Structures are given as structure tokens and as C-alpha cells.
């Protein structure tokens, strides 16, 4: 298990690209495209996730590529903000590999978050194997998502968070 104290400017050497269990708490993570990526199981608790304006039509926060039996990236009580990104131009994630997973639980989402929330990878035909989930989002970027984004009920969200904490939190 790894713990990163101060977050990272991604993509970087501490980005969760290695297939390990990683834990981030009370830190800021910033980048423009796919800045949280890779095959790790990672828990982000009470972090600020900042998207930097790249002046392209769209940006993506996560690009998970984890194992089918893993937890993927789990964000709990995080604040998704931007540095002047236009409204609706930033997606919470897209699957780098078919089994990528991202869950956003009880997070505050700025207006920069696209109404769809998540996006398929442009050239992938197997994006339906990925798992994108959300529960309890608030803020201007919270919206009804497409059918392929799973809406978790409170019990499902609590169970996912419990499992992610057990797997990722340092002892």
C-alpha cells in the first residue's frame, strides 16, 4: 500500500498507474487530460481534483485500466474544480482499458463537469465492460447520467467505500 501526502500534478510518477493499492487524503491533484490514470486501486478522500484548462474541446479526469476484480478509482467527499474550463467540457473519466472502473461518491462537482459524467474511449468497442458509478453528487456538475453510468444507492455506495478503505488505507 502506498500513501501520497500532498497529491500530485498529473500525470506524474505518483499517479496511480502502477497496479498497487494507493490512498490519497486531504490533498490536491491537478492536470488537464487523463491525469489520474492506470491500473491501481486508489481511494481519494476529501481531495480537491483540479482540471486545468487545456483549450481543447474536452478533458478527462480519469483513465482507469484496472483489473476486473479490482475496485478501481474511488472518490469520496472530493471537490472537483477547474481553472477556467468551460461549462460541460470535462468528463469524470473514460476507460483506458475495458475493465477500468471509477466511482464518484458524495462529491461536489463544478459546472465544468459534462452532463454525461463519463465518456467512452473514442476508438474502443468494448467500453461497455468498464464500470462507472456515482452516488450523492452535488453541485452544478451533478446531473442525470446516461444509462451506462451506474447510480448506486446508499447501501451500495457505503459498501464500495468500506471495501476501498479496507484495501487502500495504510494500516
Where are the regions that the model predicts?
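Sequence-level preference for short, compositionally simple segments enriched
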Residues: 1-171
Amino acid at each position: 500500500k502506498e500513501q501520497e501526502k500532498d497529491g500530485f500534478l498529473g500525470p506524474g510518477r505518483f499517479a496511480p498507474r502502477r497496479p498497487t493499492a494507493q490512498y490519497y487524503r486531504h490533498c490536491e491533484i491537478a492536470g488537464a487530460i487523463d491525469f489520474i490514470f492506470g491500473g491501481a486501486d486508489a481511494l481519494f478522500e476529501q481531495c480537491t481534483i483540479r482540471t486545468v484548462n487545456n483549450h481543447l474541446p474536452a478533458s478527462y479526469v480519469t483513465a482507469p485500466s484496472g483489473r476486473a476484480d479490482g475496485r478501481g478509482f474511488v472518490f469520496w467527499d472530493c471537490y472537483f474544480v477547474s481553472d477556467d474550463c468551460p461549462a460541460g467540457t470535462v468528463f469524470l473519466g473514460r476507460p483506458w482499458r475495458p475493465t477500468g472502473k471509477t466511482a464518484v461518491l458524495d462529491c461536489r462537482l463544478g459546472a465544468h463537469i459534462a452532463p454525461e459524467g463519463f465518456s467512452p474511449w473514442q476508438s474502443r468497442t468494448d467500453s461497455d465492460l468498464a464500470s462507472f458509478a456515482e452516488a450523492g453528487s452535488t453541485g452544478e456538475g451533478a446531473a442525470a447520467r446516461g444509462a451506462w453510468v451506474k447510480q448506486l444507492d446508499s447501501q451500495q455506495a457505503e459498501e464500495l467505500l468500506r471495501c476501498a478503505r479496507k484495501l487502500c488505507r495504510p494500516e
